[in-house]
């Protein structure tokens, strides 16, 4: 199995969140999802708020929520530099659902005092956290 794996490293400003061999990954690119496997062509891509999905070297499907950043694929390794990232198994789902509800309420209000772009991003982050916490199919 090792011959079909490559290194994934997920880094935030605070820490290295993940570093291990994986079989494949799907990242939320700005213009759609980006699938990466071993021997992928070199690539640098901007990432959107969303769910990063990957399969470990032992075949376990995992998810993490990321809130944008960049991804570099080079020499059979992938490095994700994320503004924030959180393992799906560590997400407080109740807190994420509450954040989603708050953002939706902010977006319903038509007021110059509400920063709608910021509320939309908060909603996207909450949805990504909820989706990352769900069990893979």
Curated annotation (Swiss-Prot):
Highest taxon of the lineage: Bacteria
GO cellular component, as recorded: plasma membrane; proton-transporting ATP synthase complex
Subcellular location, record wording: Cell membrane
Membrane topology according to the record: Peripheral membrane protein
Major location (coarse): membrane
InterPro entries, per the entry: ATP_F1_dsu/esu_C_sf, ATP_synth_F1_dsu/esu, ATP_synth_F1_dsu/esu_N, ATP_synth_F1_esu_C, ATPsynth_dsu/esu_N
Signal peptide range in chain numbering: none
Single GO molecular function: proton-transporting ATP synthase activity, rotational mechanism
Keywords, comma-separated and alphabetical: ATP synthesis, Cell membrane, CF(1), Hydrogen ion transport, Ion transport, Membrane, Transport
Function: Produces ATP from ADP in the presence of a proton gradient across the membrane.
Subunit annotation: F-type ATPases have 2 components, CF(1) - the catalytic core - and CF(0) - the membrane proton channel. CF(1) has five subunits: alpha(3), beta(3), gamma(1), delta(1), epsilon(1). CF(0) has three main subunits: a, b and c.
Family the entry assigns: Belongs to the ATPase epsilon chain family.
PANTHER family in alphabetical order: ATP SYNTHASE DELTA/EPSILON CHAIN (PTHR13822), ATP SYNTHASE EPSILON CHAIN, CHLOROPLASTIC (PTHR13822:SF10)
UniProt protein name: ATP synthase epsilon chain
Species this chain originates from: Syntrophomonas wolfei subsp. wolfei (strain DSM 2245B / Goettingen)
Gene: atpC
